[in-house]
Amino acid sequence: MGQEHRRKAVVLFSGGIDSTTCLAVAKAEGFEAYALSFFYHQRHGVEVEAARRSAPALGAREHLVLELPLDRIGGSALTGHEEVPKDVPVEKMSDRIPATYVPARNTIFLSFALAWAEVLGAADIFIGVNALDYSGYPDCRPEYIAAFERMANLAIRETVEGRMRIKVHTPLIRLTKGEIIKRGLELGLDYSLTHSCYDPDARGLACGHCDSCILRKKGFMEAGIPDPTRYVRD
């Protein structure tokens, strides 16, 4: 039973650089990957299409896309009408929690991942959070992940009855964006299939100025390879 649980993993998969690399890492570590994506009425819903394109190419055993009406809750520039911050220096990004923070997003996503993992008999969940090159979101920190893992093992029938123990994997949490990209390239990833921008235009082209675009540009520069992203012309 334990070996069967270790064989499967639920991977939170947005279609961006981090989650795509995370899925590739899970596969490289020998897991059968079940990719989980969300359309939460985010302004950059184009990332879901990127996820749909990438999941089969990455060898996901299954790709589940769930719709969540987080725009009904609001509280974020990603789901409402508030402007997405632009041109924030990298060194200032984590000084305060930005307007692109979505209330409790990773807790919501991880809870769905936990439910699916229990049904699948999968003891492992992968999430591509990063605590170095990031925008200061509280639910990307190591202490948050550790707390969720403790909660998960108190929350479901399979753990309470002793048939599995949930492990939340964060293989990218201490890597820079450049290191993440280098790791992905080692695993054969094509980053032109990914989407990062928080505020794309109607054609899906990246703005080039939001936190996510700036970190993406920084990552490719650090990795020493051309950025394949299609940006809006300034």
From Swiss-Prot:
Residues that hold Zn(2+) according to the record: C197, C207, C210, C213
Cofactor(s) listed: Zn(2+)
Catalytic activity, as annotated: 7-carboxy-7-deazaguanine + NH4(+) + ATP = 7-cyano-7-deazaguanine + ADP + phosphate + H2O + H(+)
Position of the signal peptide: none
Top-level EC class as recorded in UniProt: ligase
Top-rank taxon, per record: Bacteria
Bilayer-crossing regions: none
Enzyme Commission no: 6.3.4.20
Key words of the record: ATP-binding, Ligase, Metal-binding, Nucleotide-binding, Queuosine biosynthesis, Zinc
Cofactor note: Binds 1 zinc ion per subunit.
GO molecular function terms attached to this record: ATP binding; ligase activity, forming carbon-nitrogen bonds; zinc ion binding
Alphabetized InterPro entries for the sequence: QueC, Rossmann-like_a/b/a_fold
Disulfide bonds: none
GO annotation, biological process: queuosine biosynthetic process
Binding site for ATP: F13, S14, G15, G16, I17, D18, S19, T20, T21, C22, L23
Pathway(s) of this molecule: Purine metabolism; 7-cyano-7-deazaguanine biosynthesis
ATP-binding recorded as keyword: yes
Purpose of the protein: Catalyzes the ATP-dependent conversion of 7-carboxy-7-deazaguanine (CDG) to 7-cyano-7-deazaguanine (preQ(0)).
Similarity-based family: Belongs to the QueC family.
PANTHER family to which the protein is assigned, alphabetical: 7-CYANO-7-DEAZAGUANINE SYNTHASE
Alphabetical list of NCBIfam families matching this protein: 7-cyano-7-deazaguanine synthase QueC
Protein name according to UniProt: 7-cyano-7-deazaguanine synthase
